[in-house]
Amino acid sequence: NTGYAALSKDEDFFMDGGSKVQPDSKDVVETNLAGISDILKSQNADFYFLQEVDIDAKRSFHINEREYYENALDMSSIYACNFKCDFVPYPIPPIGKVEAGLLTMTDYQVESAKRIKLAESFSWPIKTCNLKRCMLETRIPIEGTDKELVLINFHLEAYDSGEGKKMQSQMLADKLQEEYQAGNYVIAGGDFNQTFEGVDKYEIHDTDSWVPGTVYKEDLPEGFDFAVADNAPTCRLLNGPYSGNYEDSQGYVIDGYIVSDNLQVDQVQVIDTDFEYTDHQPVSLRVTLQ
């Protein structure tokens, strides 16, 4: 989750108990974009799943971040919009215009790709200026077979009562099962906005702040498991600038993958960036097709 290249270590965010709506200058966003791009390039990955990528938004000074990443990585991308509003009227000063979404990047041959709508968590009129959550499906043909590698990039609900995440998680599970029954290889990855069963390394300091729910192995269809790591938190609370340690700054593990059992998980790890350029840290996954 790139945090639209505006939520680096010195930033906070009003929805998490901070006060800011956007960085003080365009230079901050440009520095973060360069830093995020360098981190991505250093991984030399076949596929990148990015969330919170702005196309045209006041909060990131109207920089087209999709174009930036494509140029920086010299790689093609597929985009699915999940936030498009001409004017978000809250708080003061307001968020203003937002157009943003999910980005899956690869140089492999893509057979097809599509946006899959997820359940909405909010009713009218709030939903008119809120995210429209979705999954971004990308299908890669497997040479010499009739199977496909199905990649699903997602960003589940954050600030609802929990019901939205449950509905969205069920829709994701149904999609996983459908593809597995078709004999495909499946990797779903992104920002769950939930932590994972058995992952409790980073203690919650303040239950009055944002506390993620938990997603359980039993929530997954047969043939799937989580691929997550807790060697470092994947996200921090934006109630203030990053302190440099997890005793004073709240950390969570809420980003990771779901992988079908016809894929061997060789390695999964959090790339510890010290939250230099965004409020999330990337999770690297290496698999082998079986």
Which residues fall in each region the model found?
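N-terminal, active-site-proximal structural segment of metallo-dependent hydrolase catalytic domains
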Residues: 1-71, 75, 79-90, 94-99, ...
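Active-site-proximal beta-strand elements of phosphoester/diester hydrolases
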Residues: 1-22, 114-116, 137, 147-158
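Active-site beta-strand/loop signature of hydrolases that rely on acidic residues for catalysis
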Residues: 1-2, 32-62, 105, 138, ...
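Solvent-exposed loop/turn segments at secondary-structure junctions
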Residues: 4-5, 54-57, 82-87, 110-111, ...
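Surface-exposed cleft-lining segments at the edges of enzyme active sites
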Residues: 19-25, 53-55, 119-127, 154-163
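Conserved beta strand-loop-helix elements of the APE1-like EEP
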Residues: 71-73, 97-113, 139-141, 248-264, ...
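A well-ordered secondary-structure block
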Residues: 86-149, 153
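Metal-dependent phosphoesterases centered on the DNase I-like endonuclease/exonuclease/phosphatase
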Residues: 160-261
